[in-house]
């Protein structure tokens, strides 16, 4: 997550110029062979720079042009910087992985930067209800400003039972924006059950980020309820 000012551009870059304010992202360049190929790690070889990854702890970063996105010069730097990672990660899971549509129901476990971004995008897409799950009442209240229509404090009630009761059977999509084993395992049973027939699939659980080293999932969620993970 970083905000900076462009100091130099390559000959093939036409969307940026020296002096532009820009954010750097983890979005890879467009695939030309059907596969998403990550550029090489940033390094030098025989005193020649090898561009590649995004580095935001240094004074300068050499990145592929597709990683840098122009923003308004007066954009607040502390706010604009998180767009490149947290916002794209949370919002992207809603739009590209789940492909949420209007009136579909959503639950988001964890309302930090990534979770808030998922909630906000679900609101933009007119999902309903949008259920925020966390342990902190203050964060849950804040989530309402981003579009959450309902909240569940998982330290006070069983979130799985609460969401199933709240929705009458489960949500269409559940997102884990925390990455703990307990949330890895909770997001699947809170999705709605499917039924017989290839088109009567159940809800989808979306893990945003890396899973924990271990998790236990009942196979019946897939076999009998046609839920998706």
Question: Residue spans of the language-model regions?
Answer:
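Glycine-rich beta-alpha junction loops
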Residues: 22, 26-29, 67, 179, ...
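Mid-domain Rossmann-like dinucleotide-binding core that forms the NAD(H)/NADP(H) cofactor-binding site
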Residues: 67, 72-157, 161
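Glycine-rich cofactor phosphate-binding loops and adjacent beta1-alpha1 units
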Residues: 98-101, 135, 141-228
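Cysteine-cluster motifs in flexible loop/terminal segments that predominantly coordinate metals
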Residues: 15, 25-66
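Glycine-rich beta-strand-centered segment in the early N-terminal region that forms part
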Residues: 1-32, 72-74
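Well-ordered beta-strand positions
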Residues: 21, 59-60, 129, 150, ...
């Amino acid at each position: 997550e970083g905000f900076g000012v462009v100091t130099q551009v390559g000959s093939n870059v036409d969307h940026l110029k020296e002096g532009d304010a820009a954010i750097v992202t983890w979005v890879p360049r467009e695939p030309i062979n059907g596969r998403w190929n990550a550029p090489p790690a940033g390094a030098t070889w025989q005193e020649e720079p090898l561009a590649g990854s995004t580095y935001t702890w240094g004074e300068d970063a050499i990145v592929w042009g597709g990683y840098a996105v122009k923003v308004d010069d007066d954009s607040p730097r502390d706010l604009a910087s998180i767009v490149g990672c947290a916002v794209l990660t949370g919002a992207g899971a809603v739009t590209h992985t789940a492909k949420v549509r209007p009136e579909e129901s959503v639950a988001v476990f964890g309302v930090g930067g990534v979770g808030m971004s998922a909630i906000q995008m679900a609101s933009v897409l007119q999902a309903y209800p949008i259920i925020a799950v966390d342990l902190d009442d203050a964060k849950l209240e804040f989530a309402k400003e981003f579009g959450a229509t309902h909240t569940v404090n998982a330290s006070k009630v069983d979130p799985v039972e609460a969401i199933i009761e709240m929705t009458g059977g489960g949500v269409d999509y559940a997102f884990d924006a925390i990455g703990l084993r307990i949330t890895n395992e909770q997001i699947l049973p809170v999705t709605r059950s499917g039924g017989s027939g290839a088109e009567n699939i159940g809800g989808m659980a979306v893990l945003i980020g890396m899973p924990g080293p271990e998790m236990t999932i009942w196979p019946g969620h897939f076999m009998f309820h046609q839920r998706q993970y």
